[in-house]
């Protein structure tokens, strides 16, 4: 039996351990606290991510280990993408800072995906519908 999982934009505690590879949520919170403002790329309102809480992923993995027999590949995400700008605005409002727009780096333009969203049909068919922590709830918890 082989089970594979595609994780979509994982967030949660310990993101600082990823260094430069930390996600935007962590980076924006750090910018707000250290710089007093948040930098987002131009057109951030058109960049969407399916943010997935690491705690939900851990629970899903435990459920798979105890209930799912069989092989497959499953997408793991909330299925609800949110724009970079919406997330940055939520953090900026909490931290009481402004958002500054910067150009997207040239090295990102050709390889950057503007939208990610997990197709959860196979996951739901295998293990049923799940309640995922909404990214805005996490942002509120981490304030």
What are these regions (language model features)?
Residues 32-143:
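C-terminal substrate-binding subdomain of Rossmann-fold SDR/epimerase-dehydratase oxidoreductases
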């Amino acid at each position: 039996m082989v089970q594979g999982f595609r994780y979509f934009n994982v967030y949660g505690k310990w993101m600082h351990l990823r260094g430069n590879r930390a996600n935007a949520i962590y980076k924006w919170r750090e910018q707000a606290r250290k710089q007093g403002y948040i930098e987002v790329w131009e057109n951030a309102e058109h960049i969407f991510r399916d943010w997935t809480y690491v705690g939900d992923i851990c629970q899903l993995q435990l459920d798979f280990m105890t209930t799912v027999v069989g092989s497959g590949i499953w997408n793991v995400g909330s299925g609800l993408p949110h724009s970079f700008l919406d997330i940055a605005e939520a953090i900026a409002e909490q931290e009481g800072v402004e958002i500054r727009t910067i150009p997207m780096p040239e090295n990102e333009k050709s390889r950057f995906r503007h939208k990610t969203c997990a197709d959860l049909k196979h996951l739901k068919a295998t293990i049923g519908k799940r309640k995922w922590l909404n990214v805005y709830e996490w942002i509120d918890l981490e304030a």
